[in-house]
């Protein structure tokens, strides 16, 4: 590597990115077409310890975008989406103070319309009486 950052730093940045990925429900990553996942470098100026980034495409709000999830010093996340919406306009929302258990819901909110997600979180159950 031509970077001056020691390998141990890269390893811990990769662990941070992997931890974030594990905190996002797999169905959320699949539904937004998450691909080209990578880790983010720490940024003392922004008080960011590292993070996860990935591309998304063909969501109900976003045609194509890059998502950045940054781990902040206060142990919350900042989620940035930078891309193009379905009307081909610039789309750059930010959510701050996101806790790990909120990541899936926040990503759904940033990438999908309410109409698209209204049935996703409601389990459909049919009760059948078994005679025996």
What spans do the regions from the language model cover?
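Mixed-charge, Lys/Arg-enriched low-complexity segments
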Residues: 2-8, 86-132
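Negatively charged, low-complexity tracts enriched in Asp/Glu with abundant Ser/Thr
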Residues: 2-61
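Hydrophobic transmembrane signal anchors and adjacent membrane-proximal interface regions, especially
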Residues: 27-30, 67, 125-130
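Surface-exposed beta-strand edges and flanking loops
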Residues: 56-58, 71, 81-83, 129-132
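Short, Lys/Arg-enriched charge-dense amphipathic segments
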Residues: 59-65, 111
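Intrinsically disordered, low-complexity regulatory segments enriched in Ser/Thr/Pro
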Residues: 63-98
């Amino acid at each position: 590597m031509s970077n001056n950052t020691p390998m141990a730093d890269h390893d811990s940045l990769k662990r941070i990115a992997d931890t974030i990925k594990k905190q996002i429900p797999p169905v959320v990553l699949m539904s937004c077409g998450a691909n080209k996942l990578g880790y983010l470098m720490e940024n003392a100026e922004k008080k960011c310890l590292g993070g996860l980034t990935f591309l998304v495409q063909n969501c109900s709000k976003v045609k194509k975008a890059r998502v950045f999830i940054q781990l902040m010093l206060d142990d919350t996340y900042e989620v940035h989406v930078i891309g193009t919406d379905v009307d081909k306009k610039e789309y750059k929302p930010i959510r701050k103070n996101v806790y790990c258990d909120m990541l899936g819901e926040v990503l759904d909110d940033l990438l999908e319309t309410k109409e698209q997600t209204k049935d996703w979180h409601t389990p459909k159950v049919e009760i059948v009486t078994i005679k025996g």
